[in-house]
Amino acid sequence: MYGKIIFVLLLSEIVSISASSTTEVAMHTSTSSSVTKSYISSQTNDKHKGDTYPATLGAHEVSEISVTTVYPPEEDNGEWVQPVHPFSRPAPVVIILIILCVMAGVIGTILLISYGIRLLIKA
């Protein structure tokens, strides 16, 4: 009885997901042709350009976010420089603790699943 209910719920969810994804694709293809892009500005900042493309919006049209290209820092001679910030290199103790926590999480999950299987087998 419960198996049939769960099957029907899963099937209805799959149908609703596939229906929503096809309508989003159809809506995107139908309205993307009506979205117009106009070139607004080309700003020069540290010898690099940042272009902005706004979208004009009407009813049921796809909105677009302005895009700005960010380039890595350079020295005067044109070589790339590693940005310096307080978290450039974590201490070895932090790396070891992160690895141990991930291992404990994986081992704990495996033990929890095996404990649950043992309880189901006994019942």
From Swiss-Prot:
Bilayer-spanning residue ranges: 93-113
The entry's keywords: Cell membrane, Glycoprotein, Membrane, Sialic acid, Signal, Transmembrane, Transmembrane helix
Main location, first listed in the record: membrane
Localization, UniProt: Cell membrane
Signal peptide start and end residues: 1-19
Superkingdom assignment: Eukaryota
Mod. after translation: The N-terminal extracellular domain is heavily glycosylated on serine and threonine residues.
A GO cellular component entry from the record: ankyrin-1 complex
Main function: Component of the ankyrin-1 complex, a multiprotein complex involved in the stability and shape of the erythrocyte membrane.
Family named by the database record: Belongs to the glycophorin-A family.
Subunit and partners: Component of the ankyrin-1 complex in the erythrocyte, composed of ANK1, RHCE, RHAG, SLC4A1, EPB42, GYPA, GYPB and AQP1. Interacts (via the N-terminal) with RHAG; this interaction bridges the (RHAG)2(RHCE) heterotrimer with the SLC4A1 Band 3 I dimer complexed with GYPA.
Protein name as catalogued: Glycophorin-B
Lineage of the organism: Eukaryota, Metazoa, Chordata, Craniata, Vertebrata
Gene from which the chain derives: GYPB
